[in-house]
Amino acid sequence: LDAARGPLLSWYRENRRDLPWRENRDAYRIWISEIMLQQTRVEAVKPYFARFMEHFPTVQALADCEEEELFKCWEGLGYYSRARNLKKAAEIIVSEYGGALPADHAALLSLPGIGSYTAGAIGSIAFGLPVPAVDGNVMRVLSRVAGSYEDILKQAVKKKMELAVEETLKTLKEGEAGDFNQALIETGAIVCVPNGAPLCGAPCPFYTVCEARKKDLTAEIPVKTPKKKRKIEEKTVLLVECGDKIAIRKRDDTGLLASLYEFPNLEGKLSGKEVLEQMKCRAVIEKELPTAKHIFSHVEWHMSGYLIRVTEEIPGLLFADREELKEKYPIPNAFAAYRKLAAAQTMDSCES
């Protein structure tokens, strides 16, 4: 790393992407962007980041918002625990740090939802702290540069890489830590790419020192332990329509997709007859809906569905019109296909 630090910084300053959260070194903007970028592509994050900053321009605004308002703004990004932790952390920042993120690595690490990578990114980019920010992009780059067959999903391997980066950060001029960390991340994002063959001649700032390139090992490195096979769960989703409204319900306060809204659904892939038997009310199946699939980290939902018309609202369900579905109630991306169908569905008057 020491040998490549000069070329790496020069490469970054010439090739870095123009991203909205890089307009300045504001700690709040950096924090929000880093949380959004977990599990989500840069291009997908851009419009969400702009919308979030419009709704919650300050830590205080985030701390003061209603959770449901936050979830609605987050709708479509998924992994809603990220949003929940953002609000918890904002409340702590307001009460303990006067509404400004602390310029201290240990204090950043103590906040909900902030791990070693995010604390390193905020600390180095916003405050110039010489602390590493090692994510999947960086581990991929460092593994290939070293020609290492160590499993990058092991914590001991990540710790070793963090220590290596930290040693190099100590040799940099004051204020360069943020650019160095971003340069490593950027190399992994646009040259040593996560999917497909690396673009070694992009040019890559590590071209002359990369062991994996020199030994033609880029297809084998990095090494990752295969993930466990996800459990498959089948569900039957119901778009229950009464007049100009569609039924939704709030999920439990704990567990997967906690406190979000969903369309009523039943376990298993059910026939229309089985659905009506379980509903136990006067209902008519209008049509079968397309199938959909949603992948979580540990489970896959395989969904089928029905459009169902009822003559009166069903107790225990909340009936919302299309505008409310769009503007008010946060419905997670797991139901995106059915959310789109519900929004487009032409509603008729309730039958008498």
Spell out what each predicted region is.
Residues L1-R17, E23, E186-S352:
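Intrinsically disordered, low-complexity, charged terminal extensions of DNA damage-control enzymes
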Residues D2, G6-P7, W11-P198, F206-V209, ...:
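Catalytic cores of DNA base-excision repair glycosylases
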